[in-house]
Amino acid sequence: MTSKATIIYTHTDEAPALATQSLLPIVQAFTRHAGIEVKTSDISLSGRILAAFPEHLTEAQRVPDALAELGELVKQPDANVIKLPNISASVPQLTAAIKELQAKGFAVPDYPADPQTDEEKAVRERYDRIKGSAVNPVLREGNSDRRAPKAVKNFAKKNPHSMGAWTKDSKTHVATMQSGDFFHNEQSVTVPDATSVSIVFTDKQGNKKELREPVALKAGEIIDATVMSKKALLTFLAEQVKDAKAKGVLFSLHMKATMMKVSDPIIFGHAVKVFFAPVFEKFGDKLAAAGVNVNNGFGNLLANLDKLDADTRAAVEAEIAAVYAANPDLAMVDSDKGITNLHVPSDVIVDASMPAMIRNSGRMWDKDGKAQDTKAVIPDSSYAGVYQATIDFCREHGAFDPTTMGTVPNVGLMAQAAEEYGSHNKTFEIEADGQVQVIDAAGNVLMQHDVEAGDIWRMCQTKDAPVKDWVQLAVNRARLSNTPAVFWLDENRPHDKSLLAKVNAYLAELDTNGLDIRVLAPEEAAKFSLGRLKNGEDTISVTGNVLRDYLTDLFPILELGTSAKMLSIVPLMNGGGMFETGAGGSAPKHVQQFLEENHLRWDSLGEFLALAVSFEHLAQKTGNTKAQVLADTLDAATEKLLLNDKSPKRKAGELDNRGSHFYLTLYWAQELAAQDKDAELKAAFAPLAETLTADEAKIVAELSAAQGKAADIGGYYAPDAAKAAQAMRPSATFNQALAKL
């Protein structure tokens, strides 16, 4: 036996955090017998808020900065981390979490919406570091290898999910800017030597201002800069509202306001103001005085209506009703509750919303809960064409058939906050007309843009080492799976041109003999891959960070019905491994149902898959043969779970997340008892397999009896640990059997 190995299991938010209360005790009971310790690390939104304000808390309330600790751990060669989805907090989510913590006696400060004093600005800065996708860039010290495991793919082929039919007369389409956006204004430079660059804004009077402290760059680093014109954006949005009305389709906006936490809420706010233009033309000043900020969505305006006097409020509500009557129908997030696509920025996330629409015959829901053709507005044109190509393909060829279609695994460049997903601290809403320049340490101007007040300017970085690692990973996956690999890069786009120079150089250093590796612009790559997909052929997509995110939702949702069933491996650059559980989010709607009905429909398949590859990685790194046996038997148990249809169902009274955990435990114990590679494990798990087999009906009945009534877990963002554990482990018989292991 080797000395005790450690796996870190992240404690996150919402549905996956609830599932952890049930699954983790099972995992810890099993791994103990293989000399593996599974520890938790709290990177939940509430945990990160508490860690940011130790001086506001009592000694007993303080928590370590688990995210910073984990950020260091992933750089160690023996790192082994299971990473569950966490909230990428929008401002409404952040403020709700703060309120909940304050109500529980944690004296964290309020979020300053409009900071005036230095102290308020300092508090706001700390909170802004927690906002948006604050976790993944810290932990992703490697590139991404995402694919559908064979067991999952085979199950989907035998048990196809529903796919909405497409007709040739579908009016659904993507609307994107033809000029003035990030794509059309991009400039790119590769710096030959290590340097630092300043980002300097000069106004029309010649006054200079550094927009942030200088950015350190490594040798060979690619930097890009670009700007979204506010004028061009507003013109585009107004045209699209008009066009949606003329075409009789729903108006919908698809952004990523969580990850792109600086740029996208601003764009979202402009869309709200354009759609509800008469409201802002007539009442803009009064709404601003009431604290309305529609960068947080139209819901923010509605939430602040009670701050207006009765007459003004009535007039605003009448104007809103008039806008709804005059404008195209908005796509709805929740028709029953009247929540539109423009209510909350974090409700409609492009990488999830577009595939869901495509799977649903290209339709979204209107105010009456009916599916309608839709105008999908994606203002920046960098990647919008990929979705248009997919829509065109479905319109021409009909919906995909999950029983015969191939698969599109992804190798994604994401290490060290590559590309747009690392741009937040270099993104600025411009205050006045002028010019922004990027100037190196020697005083050379590397890039410059003329800008106007309200424009959004940003800079991105892509380091050389991650690119080299990404190309190597792509070649490895192409060889191991004997599958063509396509780099989705556009040689006419400045950033992609810079990247291609590196890709070609690194490919030349590798053995690519007998491999089919090609480079296609994103729209062409989409058409090529979709054609193969329909014919049952597989194609690896090798992409940058944003397309990694988009495609690992798009293809899995079409192939498997969900992106939560993906194997998501991050081979860390220093030799460790991070195993992400699926590619979906943290499923707030699942929690809503759980609180109302005590039924959790979250599917932990992503966790099962990640655990198996985590054990396998540990076995390879440490020579722990028991870990390999755990991996093999867990894979077999997972396949059995799928074949026996023991995944969670949607309705209360049916099997839920807790029931699926029981069946996984039963099958895993049976597999361990049946195997002959490790006598100790066989002996340890035979009694458990026997007990669970005998008590199956009793345990399922106990789990089922808990459902159908409201669940109390003592909080949403910061549930009470004891209450949550009790709610998620309601079978005394099952708990006793595990305790004896």
Task: List where the protein language model places each region.
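Extended, well-ordered protein cores
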Residues: 2-269, 278-502, 506, 510-658, ...
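Ligand-binding pocket scaffold of soluble enzyme catalytic domains
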Residues: 673-676
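A glycine-biased, small/acidic residue-tolerant capping/turn segment at secondary-structure junctions
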Residues: 700-717
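C-terminal accessory extensions/subdomains outside the catalytic/core fold
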Residues: 719-741
